[in-house]
Amino acid sequence: MMTNLMEQCKVLQNASKQLSSMNTKDKNEALRQVAISLQKNESFIIQENQKDVENAEAKGMKESLVDRLRLTKDRVEGMIKGIQTIIELKDPVWKSNEVWTLENGLTVSKMTVPIGVIGIIYESRPNVTVDAFCLTLKSGNGVLLRGSSTSIFSNRALVHAIKEGLKNSDVSEAVISLIDDPDRGLVKEMLTLNEYIDLIIPRGGKELIDFVVKNATVPTIETGVGNCHIFVDESANIDEAVDIIENAKVQRPGVCNACETVLIHEKIAKDLLPKVSGRIGKQVEIRGCQHTQSLIGGKLAIEDDWAEEFLDYIVAVKVVPNVDEAIEHINHFGTKHSEAILTENLSHANQFLRQVDAAAVYVNASTRFTDGSEFGFGGEMGISTQKIHARGPMGLNELVTVKYTIVGNGQIRK
């Protein structure tokens, strides 16, 4: 029996097939119209978002997650700027980087083509609604959105604005579809609709990602939890290290590229830790190892803290004897997201870059840069922590697959 969700996905699938063959000019014009519509609907979007924010606060959601949910004028403007960046990026579809001719005269081309219908399941981050739509449209894919119930008013308003924009273009409104029923049974059904959905990308916490991986029959790409580390080596510039730690922890603690654990070389711990505590200690709860406690006091870290994605004003701090132990700690407790070393030692930097197993590895910079817009992608579908198909921020080039086209003149296989 055809369910309502199946019907919804069938319409989306048909629209995505039409979109897959559209030219770049028409897709870019559609994006331009969506940007105009978002600008026109800015006040309405912020008004609807405020309903979600008030509901979240009433339910006691922690402030770092409320901040992730909140849309401001600047954040809506940021979405619009992101669309312009995507417009300016090269179309990833129907590109051939490899063409060769076989001995029998067949010409083989490896072409990039859209994936088809991409489903994205995400928590209370309404900016994902716009990022996901724009990236899937430019890459020729339809998108099925299932946001959190905590952002339902925001998502409805954003999808309304997107569809209003599409009315002024040659792209069908049906290329975007929102599941706005909070029934969690629909998520489970969505995960098994292989006939209509080609790929599902979950964006959220460990519980959501584990649920999707466990229950999906549709192929998935995990956008993993961000237990991100900063290792401060003995040769690091201490003042620069304090600035980077503050940025990575405090700027937006509720996002996946925020720093959750700081590892400090024992030779500079006495000089660095008081400065870190002085800079962030009033705002951030520091959970330290015994060595850390002996220098700055604070709460003693427990074993679970080393594996925790706090998404809050909490940081775990551990003093380590060398770069080898820092790397071992990161590879044991990390989530393969974003890791950083602060050092003036080129050998240690290269060792860290090669041996740390993560999607993004930094030298002398904040982990906060692991982001599609910061990488110049205009946005992202998520930050993949797996190794197959896509890894790191997923922009346009990660939303296509390949098709081999073979042109002959009557060849038969002997």
Curated annotation (Swiss-Prot):
GO terms for molecular function: glutamate-5-semialdehyde dehydrogenase activity; NADP binding. The keyword Glycoprotein does not apply. GO terms for cellular component: cytoplasm. It catalyses: L-glutamate 5-semialdehyde + phosphate + NADP(+) = L-glutamyl 5-phosphate + NADPH + H(+). It comes from the Bacteria. Pathway: Amino-acid biosynthesis; L-proline biosynthesis; L-glutamate 5-semialdehyde from L-glutamate: step 2/2. Its EC number is 1.2.1.41. The keyword NADP applies. SUPFAM superfamilies: ALDH-like. One of its GO terms (biological process) is L-proline biosynthetic process. Keywords: Amino-acid biosynthesis, Cytoplasm, NADP, Oxidoreductase, Proline biosynthesis. It is found in: Cytoplasm. Catalyzes the NADPH-dependent reduction of L-glutamate 5-phosphate into L-glutamate 5-semialdehyde and phosphate. The product spontaneously undergoes cyclization to form 1-pyrroline-5-carboxylate. Belongs to the gamma-glutamyl phosphate reductase family. This is Gamma-glutamyl phosphate reductase. It comes from Alkaliphilus metalliredigens (strain QYMF). The lineage of its organism: Bacteria, Bacillati, Bacillota, Clostridia, Peptostreptococcales.
